[in-house]
């Protein structure tokens, strides 16, 4: 489908605006994946706060120019599906990783987080980041365990002091 200049400018403007507010980005190749499966992926992406779009590589290079995602430029080869995580840095990576397990033809190319390029082989680094709620829960569990341990040690010290007296 041929795009005129106004269409291209609109696409670049829209995706650039999304990129400004994104926490991370993941690039994938979806050749060979059925339309039904892609529709499921897009639906799951909307629910997870992930913006997805298939964009021409030349337009994507313009979009990422001067942003924290500029390191992805070399990954823009062949059909490119880009996903921006809007709410949680690992959301798009987690979504693509799970989708790639179920669909062998779906290939994750690379990801970017805070200006760092993450190759597809290391996508788990980004996908396994805990959500905000999970991180708070882990912190609270650690604090609770520490205070319980302190209480046990204090009671043991009191018991030892009473036995010694």
UniProtKB/Swiss-Prot annotation:
<comment type="subunit">
    <text>Part of the ribosomal stalk of the 50S ribosomal subunit. The N-terminus interacts with L11 and the large rRNA to form the base of the stalk. The C-terminus forms an elongated spine to which L12 dimers bind in a sequential fashion forming a multimeric L10(L12)X complex.</text>
</comment>
<keyword id="KW-0694">RNA-binding</keyword>
<keyword id="KW-0689">Ribosomal protein</keyword>
<comment type="function">
    <text>Forms part of the ribosomal stalk, playing a central role in the interaction of the ribosome with GTP-bound translation factors.</text>
</comment>
<keyword id="KW-0687">Ribonucleoprotein</keyword>
<dbReference type="InterPro" id="IPR002363">
    <property type="entry name" value="Ribosomal_uL10_CS_bac"/>
</dbReference>
<dbReference type="GO" id="GO:0003735">
    <property type="term" value="F:structural constituent of ribosome"/>
</dbReference>
<dbReference type="InterPro" id="IPR047865">
    <property type="entry name" value="Ribosomal_uL10_bac_type"/>
</dbReference>
<dbReference type="InterPro" id="IPR043141">
    <property type="entry name" value="Ribosomal_uL10-like_sf"/>
</dbReference>
<dbReference type="GO" id="GO:0070180">
    <property type="term" value="F:large ribosomal subunit rRNA binding"/>
</dbReference>
<dbReference type="InterPro" id="IPR022973">
    <property type="entry name" value="Ribosomal_uL10_bac"/>
</dbReference>
<protein>
    <recommendedName>
        <fullName>Large ribosomal subunit protein uL10</fullName>
    </recommendedName>
</protein>
<dbReference type="GO" id="GO:0015934">
    <property type="term" value="C:large ribosomal subunit"/>
</dbReference>
<dbReference type="GO" id="GO:0006412">
    <property type="term" value="P:translation"/>
</dbReference>
<dbReference type="InterPro" id="IPR001790">
    <property type="entry name" value="Ribosomal_uL10"/>
</dbReference>
<keyword id="KW-0699">rRNA-binding</keyword>
<comment type="similarity">
    <text>Belongs to the universal ribosomal protein uL10 family.</text>
</comment>
<dbReference type="Pfam" id="PF00466">
    <property type="entry name" value="Ribosomal_L10"/>
</dbReference>
């Amino acid at each position: 489908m041929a795009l005129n200049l106004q269409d291209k400018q609109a696409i670049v403007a829209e995706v650039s605006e999304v990129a400004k507010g994104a926490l991370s980005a993941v690039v994938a190749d979806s050749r060979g994946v059925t339309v039904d499966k892609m529709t499921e992926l897009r639906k799951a992406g909307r629910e997870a706060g992930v913006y997805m779009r298939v964009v021409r590589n030349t337009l994507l290079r313009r979009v990422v120019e001067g942003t924290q995602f500029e390191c992805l430029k070399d990954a823009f080869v062949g059909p490119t599906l880009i996903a921006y995580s809007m709410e949680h840095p690992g959301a798009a990576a987690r979504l693509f990783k799970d989708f790639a397990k179920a669909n062998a033809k779906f290939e994750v190319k690379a990801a970017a987080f805070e200006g760092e390029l993450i190759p597809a082989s290391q996508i788990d680094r980004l996908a396994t980041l805990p959500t905000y709620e999970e991180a708070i829960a882990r912190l609270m569990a650690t604090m609770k365990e520490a205070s319980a341990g302190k209480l046990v040690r204090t009671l043991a010290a009191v018991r030892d002091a009473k036995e010694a007296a």
